[in-house]
Each structure stands twice: as structure tokens, then as C-alpha cells.
Swiss-Prot record:
High-level lineage: Eukaryota, Viridiplantae, Streptophyta, Embryophyta, Tracheophyta
Taxonomy, superkingdom: Eukaryota
Subunit note: Interacts with SWI3A and SWI3B, but not with BRM.
Function: Component of a multiprotein complex equivalent of the yeast SWI/SNF complex, an ATP-dependent chromatin-remodeling complex, which is required for the positive and negative regulation of gene expression of a large number of genes. It changes chromatin structure by altering DNA-histone contacts within a nucleosome, leading eventually to a change in nucleosome position, thus facilitating or repressing binding of gene-specific transcription factors.
Name under which the protein is recorded: Chromatin structure-remodeling complex protein BSH
Record keywords, A-Z: Activator, Cell cycle, Chromatin regulator, Nucleus, Transcription, Transcription regulation
Subcellular location: Nucleus
Length: 240
């Protein structure tokens, strides 16, 4: 499956999302004048900045939000894009890094929990395609679940990519004074990656069989309206 085949690239690369499409995960949670707007989507950092304001105006119009939300939405998107762009041009070190991705999401009435391995070094990976296949294999019918799964994957990959910038910086400093020690650390990391690859075959279906570790078995539940109302009430209390 696309996104789960190791490329074998070990050297540092310039910072970007470790996926085929370099898209920034944007999350909005804005409260203003007694109303709340929440959304999550991806944004191409190469798009012109004026697209942000256009998007904010269109969103406010479509959702009939107070016009003051335009500034709030635009500023939040711009701030997150600026954070991403601050890393562009810096080296990030991925090495042979097979990482666990964890899902714990509720989308409408669907609750989905899963954990699987992802090759951070595969820059041809496609979270959206992976999410579509996952939902198909699990029999998930709600069309909003797939995009939410893909977004959750991208958010985690983004955080790890940021950490990889720090790793590249530390690696450069270490090589100046402790080359022997670096070699040992790299060997251990490589060995761990290979051990994980032996345990989990990336050629298998997204749905894990029962013979695999229980922690890697996906769980999908359909919640009742009462359960959803209770969860939303709890989320509202935590948001205050």
C-alpha cells in the first residue's frame, strides 16, 4: 500500500511534510460573540497569502457567522502557516524511522481507535488514500470519517517532522565531537526500525488479524444519539 513502503533514504532533507503532498494541517477553534467555529483542514503553504482572507470570507458567508470572524479565522490560519514556514529551509533527519500512528477519534456517531506503523522516510506516502482504504476495510460508511483520519495522521507526521529538525541539528553538533558515539546511536536506531519491520508486514491489509498484537487491532463503534450528546456536553465543559 502506498505510504507503507520504505524508501531507504537516510540522509537529511529540507523540512517539509513527509508525504507526497506538502500540505499543512490547520486546526481552528474560535469563539467570538457567543458563537463557536471549529474546523480542521489542510493548506498548501505555497498558495498566495490573499487566499487566506478569501477563504475566511467565504466560510463566514456560508456559515452565516458574524463578519468579525473573518479576521479571527484569517489570523489563525496565517499564524499556523507562519509556524510551518519558519522551519522551511532547515534540515530534518528522518533516517530509517518507522513510527507508530495512533487514532482516537469521534466523527459524528462513529468512534474509531487504531494504531499502526508509518514510514516517515517515505515521501510518496498518501494519508488520504490510506484513510480511504482503512475506512473501506473497516466498513465505515460516514464519509466524514476518512478526511478526519487523514488529518489526524498529518497532524502527527507534522509534529514528528518538527522533532526531526531538532534531531538534525543535534546530529550536526554531535558529529563535531562524538563521531564514534553517533555511530553507535545510529546503529541502535536502525536496528530498532528493522525489528519493527520484521514484526509488522506492510504488505498486509490495513485491518490487522487477531494473531497480531492487540494494541494494533482497530476498534470501530457506532454511538447512540444519547452517547453523542453526553460526549459533546463533556467536551463543551472542558472547552470552557
Amino acid at each position: 500500500m502506498k505510504g507503507l513502503v520504505s524508501t531507504g533514504w537516510k540522509g537529511p532533507v529540507k523540512f517539509r511534510m513527509p508525504t507526497a503532498e506538502n500540505l499543512v494541517p490547520i486546526r481552528l477553534d474560535i469563539q467570538f460573540e457567543g458563537q463557536r467555529y471549529k474546523d480542521a483542514f489542510t493548506w498548501n503553504p505555497s498558495d498566495p497569502d490573499n487566499e487566506v482572507v478569501i477563504f475566511a470570507k467565504r466560510t463566514v458567508k456560508d456559515l452565516k457567522l458574524p463578519y468579525a470572524f473573518v479576521t479571527q479565522i484569517a489570523q489563525s490560519i496565517q499564524s499556523q502557516l507562519s509556524d510551518f514556514r519558519a522551519y522551511e529551509g532547515q534540515d530534518m533527519y528522518t533516517g530509517e524511522k518507522i513510527i507508530p500512528i495512533k487514532l482516537d477519534l469521534r466523527v459524528n456517531h462513529t468512534l474509531i481507535k487504531d494504531q499502526f506503523l508509518w514510514d516517515l522516510n517515505n515521501f510518496e506516502s498518501d494519508p488520504e488514500e490510506f484513510a480511504r482504504t482503512l475506512c473501506k476495510d473497516l466498513g465505515v460508511e460516514d464519509p466524514e470519517v476518512g478526511p478526519a483520519v487523514a488529518f489526524a495522521i498529518r497532524e502527527q507526521l507534522y509534529e514528528i517532522a518538527i522533532q526531526s529538525v531538532a534531531s538534525a541539528r543535534e546530529s550536526r553538533l554531535s558529529k563535531k565531537g562524538r563521531r564514534g558515539s553517533d555511530h553507535g546511536s545510529a546503529s541502535k536506531a536502525s536496528g530498532l526500525s528493522m525489528d519493527l519491520m520484521k514484526l509488522f508486514s506492510f504488505k498486509s491489509s490495513v485491518v490487522r488479524k487477531r494473531k497480531d498484537l492487540d494494541v494494533y487491532e482497530p476498534v470501530v463503534d457506532l454511538l447512540t444519539s444519547e452517547e453523542v450528546d453526553a460526549l459533546e456536553a463533556r467536551e463543551e465543559r472542558h472547552a470552557r
